[in-house]
Design a protein with these regions (language model features):
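Cyclic nucleotide-binding regulatory module and flanking cytosolic helices
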Residues: 1-37, 82, 87-90
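Short loop/turn microsegments at loop-to-beta-strand junctions
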Residues: 31, 49-50
Length: 160
């Protein structure tokens, strides 16, 4: 993806208009385009805190993995969504790590953790945007917990 295409992607976000020209260039200089085939591990115990993922196309599964190997899906991300928990080490209120897998072939942009941290410190609008997205994803998590604890198995299957 060329610089102009990246620019078009980011101009749609509300924080963009509040960034300095220097920070905009810094973001565009540090963004990396990645492709993962279906089934690939994007973030795992071996590769933690990648940075922020901007999903251009595909489906990502964000989940917890217990020491015993049990998995609990937190939520799924789809085209044009943003994965903030892939940069959990940069978010002071997040104290756990997640696993992220590509459920379908995925094209995404990665803003690595260190440049992401610098930009968040420089721009309160970006920081607010990221925390807002994170809380929106936690609403999905709470909805899943409610289904698990408060619906019968039959109700959950019917809703699926």
């Amino acid at each position: 993806m060329d610089r102009n295409s990246c620019l078009n992607c980011f101009q749609a976000f509300p924080f963009w208009e509040h960034m300095t020209e220097e920070d905009r260039n810094f973001l565009l200089d540090n963004i990396r385009e990645l492709h993962y085939p279906a089934g690939a591990a994007i973030q795992s115990e071996e590769r933690q805190c990648l940075g922020t993922l901007f999903l251009l196309k595909g489906v990502l599964r964000v989940y917890l993995l217990s020491a015993q190997g049990k998995e609990a899906t937190l939520y799924r991300l789809r085209d044009s969504d943003i994965c903030t928990l892939s940069a959990s080490c940069m978010l002071s209120a997040i104290t756990f790590d997640v696993q992220i897998d590509a459920e379908t072939d995925c094209d995404l942009l990665l803003l690595p953790a260190v440049p992401f941290s610098r930009l968040m410190k420089n721009n309160i609008y970006l920081e607010n945007f990221i925390y807002k997205r994170t809380t929106e994803h936690f609403s999905d998590v709470i909805a899943g917990i409610e289904r698990t604890f408060f619906m019968t198995l039959t109700q959950r299957i019917a809703a699926f």
